[in-house]
Amino acid sequence: MLPGLRRLLQAPASACLLLMLLALPLAAPSCPMLCTCYSSPPTVSCQANNFSSVPLSLPPSTQRLFLQNNLIRTLRPGTFGSNLLTLWLFSNNLSTIYPGTFRHLQALEELDLGDNRHLRSLEPDTFQGLERLQSLHLYRCQLSSLPGNIFRGLVSLQYLYLQENSLLHLQDDLFADLANLSHLFLHGNRLRLLTEHVFRGLGSLDRLLLHGNRLQGVHRAAFRGLSRLTILYLFNNSLASLPGEALADLPSLEFLRLNANPWACDCRARPLWAWFQRARVSSSDVTCATPPERQGRDLRALREADFQACPPAAPTRPGSRARGNSSSNHLYGVAEAGAPPADPSTLYRDLPAEDSRGRQGGDAPTEDDYWGGYGGEDQRGEQMCPGAACQAPPDSRGPALSAGLPSPLLCLLLLVPHHL
């Protein structure tokens, strides 16, 4: 080493300055202003900063990006790095997502776009390329329709949150590519009809929530193929009748909620009543709204004599296909004109299980067991800071890097006491 350089390095301040100069070309990308970053796993947390756009110069190694509770309006291609695994954008002002925005995020596993009240439509290829996506959140937006191929190619998707939108209709085969989907949340929309092939392809579905819609008809084959479904919520709709064949296609069903519908307990109720005589499920009450002499009674508690004047019902067996030339009203179980509307229901969760003919024994699973790992979107939407991003345990994360304090400067600060 040259004598002059040796003397320079013997001065602590000079040595630190040289260290800073040498470190600059090798320094990791800086953390965006007002954000907090972690090194392991690479995480950028920028929530609740009133950002109107995604921060520039995000570290390309970022795997988790939290941008919720900002004012972001538009998403464009090239904004996000290809290493992302988790992307939270809920509770922003999103109104436009340009085609190709997520196309190169082939590693992405979770995408939360929920609670964006200005997001009224999506392009057909919005989610193209997200073959590893497992969880997609689109709750509480203003979506009134969905393109027929919007979910095409999402072969790894397990959780789909579409509740509290303004959806009026679901196209047949909308979910055809979602063979691994286990949870589908559609409650709080404006759906009026469930068609024959609306849920085709969902062979792994475990929970289907359809309460709080405006359903008037369910096709007798609407649930065909849902052989693993255990939870079905249809309460707080406008259903006066329901084809017994529809429920007969659900051999694994354990929890059924049908309350707060204007059930007609006349001859139209016989198929549903007959299904209840054979089924072993935990069910809510099914209160009769008509005819007047049966108003207030539970449909499940009716007797064979109550249907004595009805024409003989064709026997149905679980999983059997509908035969014959039936009218559309019979296929869908549509209520007659003038049926009273459903009473408003506040029972959106944790409904009591009422089933005198249901499972026996203390070891049977309860509904709470099935919901133990589910965090409602209402609670999540209020979350200002993900705990995993804001509190980094020392054994799982590297040091937090705050924007505005380059790490080489720490060296200079540590040397200050040597000169006092």
From Swiss-Prot:
Please give the InterPro entries that the UniProt record associates with this protein: Cys-rich_flank_reg_C, Leu-rich_rpt, Leu-rich_rpt_typical-subtyp, LRR_dom_sf, LRR_TM_domain-containing
Q: Which residues form the signal peptide?
A: 1-46
Where it sits in the cell: the answer is: Cell membrane; Membrane raft; Cell projection, Dendrite; Perikaryon
Segments of this protein annotated with the region Important for interaction with MAG = 315-327
State the Pfam families in the record.
LRR_8
An annotated GO BP: axon regeneration
The residue intervals holding the LRR repeats read 61-82, 83-104, 107-129, 132-153, 156-177, 180-201, 204-225, 228-249
GO terms, molecular function: signaling receptor activity
SUPFAM superfamilies from the UniProt entry: L domain-like
Its record classes its membrane topology as: Lipid-anchor; GPI-anchor
User: Which key words tag this protein in UniProt?
Assistant: Cell membrane, Cell projection, Disulfide bond, Glycoprotein, GPI-anchor, Leucine-rich repeat, Lipoprotein, Membrane, Receptor, Repeat, Signal
Quaternary structure and partners: Interaction with MAG is controversial, and may be indirect. Does not interact with MAG, OMG and RTN4. Interacts with MAG.
The similarity annotation says: Belongs to the Nogo receptor family.
Q: What is the designated name of this protein?
A: Reticulon-4 receptor-like 2
Originating gene: RTN4RL2
